[in-house]
Amino acid sequence: MAVYTDVAADELADFLKAYDIGELLSYKGIAEGVENSNYLLHTTAGSFFLTLYEKRVAVDDLPFFLGLMGHLATHGIVCPQPVKARNGEALGCLAGRPAAIIDFLEGVWPRKPNVTHCAAVGAALAKLHLAGRDFPMRRANALSVSSWRPLFEQATPCIDTVQHGLHDFLKAELDHLERHWPQNLPAGVIHADLFPDNVLFLGDRLSGLIDFYFACNDFFAYDVAICLNAWCFEPDHSFNVTKARALLGAYNRERALSEAEQAALPLLARGAALRFLLTRLVDFLNVPAGALVKPKDPLEYVRKLRFQQSVGNIREYGVAASGLVA
């Protein structure tokens, strides 16, 4: 979450008159993440999140995101729910931006994920994939393999200012992934951004999944690969096979990965690493002046990509291919 658009107190108070969520007591911007402007609201009725949608979030995609959260909640997935205004609409306009109020979930995201966290995330991700099977709306992944070259070209003039030789390294990897990307793996609704800061816990109990604004239709195993990169590396950039074993095993107990998915996982993990490397790189090079936002380090994903390039098969994630039992 982040703040790109400032909201005046009187403007916000007028906006909230359309909702039955009490009177505004206080609000503050949240300076985490890089995509939308987010505020935590405290009203006489409780706490809520206000999101103003900008950058990569297209207005036409918002019914998919908001509808998906409602659908998943009815299928047992704990996630935020949009608060509808008195006119029945979940989407409004504030400070010239599309805006929505989302209910507040208890919990904090884990700054130091442990094995128990990883297992909980694996199980929750599989349940999300199963719960989304009958969601009627569709959204293509706008940040899948076909989008990576335009991102690379956007960053090209400045890539080597971030790290010498990075341009040629990324070009070679992009060429490889475009040639070898899978075509026919099991697919459906995926979260596509299930990083630790998008998963809430109360102690070691998972209490909610948040930030569905990259959700789309794509390979289930690609979503798993994103989580391997996001959850299973240590601060010293080493890969923790114990965490990977916990995440993959818990996922597989809820939804079994096919042989084709297992075989493709190392390549998908390379793609997942490149996708986040490129978007971080573009964001790092294009932070608006004065924005209350902390761009994430693209070089973290250079290290993760180099590791994933070294992985030959799923066994190197600490599991056996047959039944995912080490």
Swiss-Prot record:
Gene Ontology MF term list: ATP binding; homoserine kinase activity
Transmembrane segments: none
Record EC number: 2.7.1.39
Catalytic class of the enzyme: transferase
Alphabetical keyword list: Amino-acid biosynthesis, ATP-binding, Kinase, Nucleotide-binding, Threonine biosynthesis, Transferase
SUPFAM superfamilies noted in UniProt: Protein kinase-like (PK-like) (SSF56112)
Family: Belongs to the pseudomonas-type ThrB family.
Protein name per Swiss-Prot or TrEMBL: Homoserine kinase
